[in-house]
Amino acid sequence: MTPRGTPTLVASDLDRTLIYSAAALDLRMPDADAPRLLCVEVYESRPLSYMTETAAGLLGELSRAAAFVPVTTRTREQYGRIRLPGPAPRYAICANGGHLLVDGVFDPDWRRQVAARIAAACAPLAEVRDRLSAAADPAWLLKERVAEDLFAYLVVDRALLPDGWVKDVAEWADGLGWAVSLQGRKIYAVPKPLTKSAAVRELARRTGAERILAAGDSLLDADLLLAAHRAWRPGHGELADQGWTAPQVEALTETGAAAGEEILRRFLAGV
């Protein structure tokens, strides 16, 4: 058992792990028993993401007790819309590990390191994007995006997406050094060296942290959870759907906003 007081880095995914859209809150209780909610993100003048007030209090407490690092696939602009409770995190990781933010400012040295690793091992983004676009069908393709000039994703109509399409794309992408995964309505194509875990390890090195606690719900979080000494995943999401686990990862039964609360309780107990 690791003694309390050991320098610890708490690295957590955000969307559908700590913060939730209205559709993802999964409020199954009677309306009169529903938790009070705190809006933590507004987009185009509309509330978009929430935490329960209980989770907000727990996060504020955690941020004062340990080095808390938000870790997200969001771009820097998308991350900038989020207003988490408690002290502002000194460090944040955006673009699936492509950007380190230090006091809100991106670290150009880290970006250069990431770019060099990708260039050495992967086909160019433009090539992968072109092949992805050519393989997609306008009947189910809703949007096509490139994030931070690092990776690409498609927003699709899941009901019309053909069975086996993602698997077929993943096979040719693998030979180009890219990984493809379906997460909700999005199909991500991400260069294999672009990982959340690499960025978290770099922050652990910089901060002198001897232990990492982590949480996440999606396939892009798997490497982050594997890099942690202890980790948790909620009862929803792609990892839960696949029954994914690892020795240091605890699969929680809670889903939606209740899972966000429970993850924060586990973090606090672990620091």
How would you label these PLM feature ranges?
Residues 26-30, 86-88, 231:
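Glycine-rich, phosphate-binding/catalytic loops in enzymes
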Residues 9, 67-68, 91, 179, ...:
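Proline-centered loop/turn at the N-terminus of a beta-strand
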Residues 49-133:
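Active-site phosphate-binding/coordination module
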Residues 129-213, 218-227:
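Conserved acidic, metal-coordinating active-site core of Asp-based
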Residues 2-70, 80:
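Active-site neighborhood of HAD-like aspartate-dependent phosphohydrolases
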Residues 21-22, 79-82, 103-104, 223-224, ...:
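Short glycine-/acidic-enriched loop or helix-start segments at secondary-structure transitions
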Residues 26, 190, 197-271:
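Mg2+-dependent phosphoryl-transfer enzymes with acidic/Ser/Thr/Gly-rich catalytic loops
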Residues 5-7, 65, 89, 149, ...:
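A general structural motif
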